[in-house]
């Protein structure tokens, strides 16, 4: 009887240990999720048609691959920074696409130049990220395997 009880306890302990180990592996796998596809879209034009096209490109590629299978980041610098300011003609669309897991990044150097020239810092749409150098961000993303698109 004692031998049987010992075997049951050992089996139970082994089961608990394996369940904990499996749970940790599953958790680690989801933490490091990497989408099948990655794209960075450059916007360096002040033209509202270019802004609309960049957003359409992002939406279309996300629809094609599926929201869970692609990472999309739009990086704006130079004259293209106007796309990500509160005065942009696409402000509402940019805000709604953030909900759809599209990332927007503004160039800090461009913002500093605008502030120096106008005396006012541009006001970005809420949720837009900022890096020091937009072009460097694009290079870094390409080095991480992102495909490059310029509408």
For the regions a protein language model found, what residue spans apply to each?
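Short, low-complexity disordered leader/linker segments with a strong preference
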Residues: 6, 20-23
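Bacterial N-terminal signal peptides
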Residues: 10-18
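Secreted/extracellular ectodomain signature
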Residues: 22-151
């Amino acid at each position: 009887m004692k031998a049987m009880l010992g075997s049951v306890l050992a089996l139970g302990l082994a089961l608990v240990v394996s369940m904990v180990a499996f749970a940790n592996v599953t958790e680690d796998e989801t933490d490091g999720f990497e989408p099948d596809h990655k794209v960075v879209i450059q916007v360096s034009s002040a033209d509202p048609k270019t802004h609309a096209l960049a957003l359409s490109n992002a939406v279309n590629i996300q629809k094609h691959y599926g929201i869970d299978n692609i990472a999309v980041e739009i990086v704006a610098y130079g004259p293209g920074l106007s796309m990500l300011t509160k005065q942009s003609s696409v402000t509402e669309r940019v805000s709604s696409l953030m909900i759809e897991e599209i990332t927007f990044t503004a160039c800090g150097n461009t913002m500093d130049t605008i502030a120096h020239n106008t005396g006012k810092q541009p006001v970005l749409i809420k949720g837009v990220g900022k890096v020091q150098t937009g072009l460097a961000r694009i290079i870094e993303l390409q080095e991480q395997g992102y495909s490059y698109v310029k509408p």
